[in-house]
């Protein structure tokens, strides 16, 4: 198949990670694959040389044009690609990219699959969404969701043509040897960004540290530039916690840096289906996670069986759960061992095959009209 993915850029984030994994896998399997982006960022995921990257965003000469003109040009450039290259299908990831792709597809005959990657409540319920969803979503050939909670937000006509597919993880997170001895570390991975509520995690760990002063907290993740990093740095400095609360920065080697930790702590207030959480579970880490909307953690964690779920924004519950996993190592290892079973079901190849079968069905349905 000739497959195109559309999103803003490939800067390290959840949707970008999924697109890079899927594109690389499809290309490896012999499909002709394009990634259509609006711009390039500094900290991007790597894509295979077999994947063709195409710029469909604004050109330098467009910078001085008005806002409406810029919007129309972005639609025009994407429409031109669809018209000229005639991909079998375009998969659009994330909010504005979805609207652009659905608009740009008019008159091309190219089916568009929408991929919602976040909690729709708060992201698809603004006044303009209430206009664009009924106007544009009927044009979608299909819709991919990560959780039931995401799907339930949308009207019946969207749900009817949708499917739930989990995110793929890189094979490097599979079959990582179990540590002979766990380090006295609590870890988290993910961008430093407001909705991940890392301040709450740090505040919870400050309480943990009073009881377990030999443990440290390491947070791996790039700066999202929204001010969260500065808030975290101030919180660490204010509590004189520099020796045991550490911001490690972004990393491409988490499969080497995370597995020996005693606890993986996930603190988000809302998410779609968090890739970082899937990776931690697949590594066999004992996990405590907030039961955040729209149900991502609950989709993959059965509390008390392969991890522990706690309420969002609840420092006390997070503190208690981390302490439990530190103190009851038998429970922690049992949870981690069960968590590891998730990995084989969400490999890049298995998830790509689910996407491929869904795409084939959509293409066949379109041709049979």
Predicted segments, located by residue:
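Short His-centered aromatic/hydrophobic patch
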Residues: 92-98, 116
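N-terminal strand-loop element at the rim of the active site
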Residues: 5-13, 17-19, 25-65, 153-155, ...
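A short, well-ordered alpha-helix in the C-terminal region of glycosyltransferases
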Residues: 317, 324, 331-345, 357
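Aromatic "clamp/platform" in nucleotide-sugar-dependent glycosyltransferases that forms part
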Residues: 250, 269
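A conserved mid-protein helix/loop that constitutes part of the nucleotide-sugar donor-binding site
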Residues: 16-21, 184, 193-210, 230, ...
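Donor nucleotide-sugar binding/catalytic pocket of nucleotide-sugar-dependent glycosyltransferases
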Residues: 138-175
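Conserved acidic donor-binding segment of nucleotide-sugar-dependent glycosyltransferases
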Residues: 302-304, 308-315, 323-329, 344
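Short hydrophobic beta-strand element within catalytic cores of glycosyltransferases
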Residues: 286-291
């Amino acid at each position: 198949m000739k497959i195109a993915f559309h999103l803003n850029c490939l800067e390290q984030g959840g949707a970008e990670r999924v697109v890079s994994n899927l594109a690389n896998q499809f290309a490896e399997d012999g499909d002709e694959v394009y990634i259509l982006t609006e711009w390039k960022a500094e900290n991007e995921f790597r894509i295979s040389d077999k994947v063709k990257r195409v710029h469909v965003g604004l050109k330098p000469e467009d910078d001085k044009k008005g806002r409406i003109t810029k919007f129309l040009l972005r639609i025009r450039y994407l429409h031109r690609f669809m018209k000229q290259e005639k991909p079998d299908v375009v998969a659009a990831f994330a909010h504005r990219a979805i609207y652009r792709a659905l608009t740009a597809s008019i008159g091309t005959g190219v089916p568009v699959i929408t991929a919602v990657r976040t909690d729709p409540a708060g992201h698809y319920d603004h006044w303009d969404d209430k206009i664009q969803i009924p106007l544009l979503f009927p044009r979608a050939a299909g819709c991919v969701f990560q959780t039931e909670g995401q799907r339930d937000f949308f009207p019946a006509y969207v749900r009817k043509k949708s499917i739930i597919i989990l995110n793929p993880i890189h094979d490097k997170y599979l079959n990582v040897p179990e540590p002979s001895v766990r380090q006295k570390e609590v870890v988290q991975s993910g961008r430093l960004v407001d909705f991940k509520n890392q301040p709450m995690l740090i505040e919870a760990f400050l309480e943990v540290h009073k009881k377990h002063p030999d443990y440290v907290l390491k947070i791996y993740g790039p700066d999202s530039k929204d001010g969260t990093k500065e808030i975290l740095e101030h919180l660490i400095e204010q509590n004189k916690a520099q020796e045991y609360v550490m911001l490690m920065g972004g990393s491409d080697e988490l499969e080497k840096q995370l597995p020996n930790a005693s606890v993986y702590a996930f603190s988000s207030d809302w998410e779609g289906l968090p890739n970082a959480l899937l990776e931690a579970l697949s590594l066999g880490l004992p996990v405590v996670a907030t039961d955040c909307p729209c149900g991502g953690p609950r989709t993959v964690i059965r509390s008390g069986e392969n991890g522990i779920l706690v309420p969002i924004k609840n420092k006390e519950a997070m503190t208690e759960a981390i302490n439990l996993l530190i103190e009851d190592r038998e429970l922690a290892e049992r949870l981690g061992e069960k968590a590891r079973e998730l990995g084989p079901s969400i490999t890049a190849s298995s998830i790509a095959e689910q996407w491929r079968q869904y795409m084939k069905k959509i293409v066949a349905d379109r041709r049979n009209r």
